From Swiss-Prot:
Protein's recorded name: Tropomyosin-1
Coiled coil regions in record: 1-276
Family classification: Belongs to the tropomyosin family.
Region described as Disordered: 1-26, 96-124
Domain comment, as recorded: The molecule is in a coiled coil structure that is formed by 2 polypeptide chains. The sequence exhibits a prominent seven-residues periodicity.
InterPro entries in the record: Tropomyosin
Transferase among keywords: no
UniProt biased composition (Polar residues): 107-121
Bias (Basic and acidic residues) ranges: 12-26
Role according to the record: Tropomyosin, in association with the troponin complex, plays a central role in the calcium dependent regulation of muscle contraction.
Origin: domain of life: Eukaryota
Keywords: Coiled coil, Repeat
Organism of this sequence: Bombyx mori (Silk moth)
Length: 284
């Protein structure tokens, strides 16, 4: 009987121990389930974060690609604008050289015009002198003609004085011939000077036309220079703006690359954390 009691007590004790162990196992199971649920919740949260990071990663990659495209386009525009500025600078330099040459030609034409005007004034003065001399010669001829008439009258009235009258007549005729020669020479000189004056007049007209054309050319060059200077300023402004845009885009590219690197690190960290969580779940 005692043996049975002892055995019953032992069985009861074993039962109590089994119950305690069962309770402990149930509690451990509940704790494990709670930890599993918590880990699963953390996994779901990590998956959400990972998905968000992947979306951010893709978005940043797209932004980076677009920023690089914009940067390349702006660099092309900057190169084209710089080439345009260089071409405009060369054209402005050529226009300035042409303008300088035109101004030199205009100055030369003005100098020639001044010299031609002075020559024309000198010829006019000579013409007036010759005209005055011719007029004096004509007056002298008239005087000699009158003297000749008087001499002839004297010859008719005084035959006794024929020798003296003949000498006087011969002298008067010689003087008359000399005067006529001088008149002819003066007329020829006047004609020559008038012809030269006509040539000078034509030269003056030609020089005036050349000067006018040169002045027009200078004005055209000045207008072209003003227009090109305006275009050059616009091109330089565009180049400056393009350069600022390129710098701005370069900063944006650098920022996106940094952000992309940060997201990659976050992605790697989350992936490592998820691997650790899955390993922890596998341990349960």
């Amino acid at each position: 009987m005692d043996a049975i009691k002892k055995k019953m007590q032992a069985m009861k004790l074993e039962k109590d121990n089994a119950m305690d162990k069962a309770d402990t196992c149930e509690q451990q199971a509940r704790d494990a389930n709670l930890r599993a649920e918590k880990v699963n919740e953390e996994v779901r949260e990590l998956q959400k974060k990972l998905a968000q990071v992947e979306e951010d990663l893709i978005l940043n990659k797209n932004k980076l690609e677009q920023a690089n495209k914009d940067l390349e386009e702006k660099e092309k525009q900057l190169t084209a604008t710089e080439a345009e500025v260089a071409a405009l600078n060369r054209k402005v330099q050529q226009i300035e050289e042409d303008l300088e040459k035109s101004e030199e030609r205009s100055g030369t034409a003005q100098q020639k015009l001044l010299e031609a005007q002075q020559s024309a004034d000198e010829n006019n003065r000579m013409c007036k002198v010759l005209e005055n001399r011719a007029q004096q010669d004509e007056e002298r001829m008239d005087q000699l003609t009158n003297q000749l008439k008087e001499a002839r009258l004297l010859a008719e009235d005084a035959d006794g004085k024929s020798d003296e009258v003949s000498r006087k007549l011969a002298f008067v005729e010689d003087e008359l011939e000399v005067a006529e020669d001088r008149v002819k020479s003066g007329d020829a000189k006047i004609s020559e000077l008038e012809e030269e004056l006509k040539v000078v007049g034509n030269s003056l007209k030609s020089l005036e036309v050349s000067e006018e054309k040169a002045n027009q050319r200078v004005e055209e060059f000045k207008k072209q220079l003003k227009t090109l200077t305006g275009k050059l300023k616009e091109a330089e402004a565009r180049a400056e703006y393009a350069e600022k845009t390129v710098k701005k885009l370069q900063k944006e590219v650098d920022r996106l690359e940094d952000e992309l690197g940060i997201n990659k690190d976050r992605y790697k960290s989350l992936a490592d954390e998820m691997d650790s969580t899955f390993a922890e779940l596998a341990g349960y």
